[in-house]
């Protein structure tokens, strides 16, 4: 009788353990699915925000470029115009990064590619930050 009791209790313990392991696996898979869904949502929101910022920045740059086109330009204005055009091209290349990277990296070795992207980052960020600063400064002057 004691042996049957021990076997029955052992069987119950083993089945309870198997069920808890199965539940743990299910909860882990459900958690993974939820994490993936939330990451997709975050990426979607980030892409929408980035798209909106790019659109607004392109519009501001086009407006700024049109003001330089309509008036007489000095050498400094011409240089600013060239930088704005470069920024516009870089922003357009963000829409199609594979094609832009393919065009720019043909025939370069890895070190030249790394230097190219570093220069490109500087070329994008410098004028963009300067332009945004100038626009905000102009707005503050007009408001004040």
UniProtKB/Swiss-Prot annotation:
Species, as recorded: Bombina maxima (Giant fire-bellied toad)
Family: Belongs to the bombinin family.
Assigned keywords, A-Z: Amidation, Amphibian defense peptide, Antibiotic, Antimicrobial, Cleavage on pair of basic residues, Cytolysis, Fungicide, Hemolysis, Secreted, Signal
Entry protein name: Maximins 7/H13
Keyword DNA damage: no
Coiled-coil intervals: none
Any one GO CC term of the record: extracellular region
Subcellular location: Secreted
């Amino acid at each position: 009788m004691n042996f049957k009791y021990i076997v029955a209790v052992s069987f119950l313990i083993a089945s309870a353990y198997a069920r808890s392991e199965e539940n743990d696996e299910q909860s882990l898979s459900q958690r993974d699915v939820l994490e993936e869904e939330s990451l997709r949502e975050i990426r979607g929101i980030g892409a929408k925000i980035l798209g909106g910022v790019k659109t607004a920045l392109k519009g501001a740059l086009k407006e700024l470029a049109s003001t330089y086109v309509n008036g007489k330009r000095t050498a400094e204005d011409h240089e600013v115009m060239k930088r704005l055009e470069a920024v516009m091209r870089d922003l357009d290349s963000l829409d199609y990064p594979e094609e832009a990277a393919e065009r720019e990296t043909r025939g370069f070795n890895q070190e030249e590619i790394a230097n190219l992207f570093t220069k490109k980052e500087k070329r994008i960020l410098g004028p963009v930050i300067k332009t945004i600063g100038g626009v905000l400064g102009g707005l503050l002057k007009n408001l004040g």
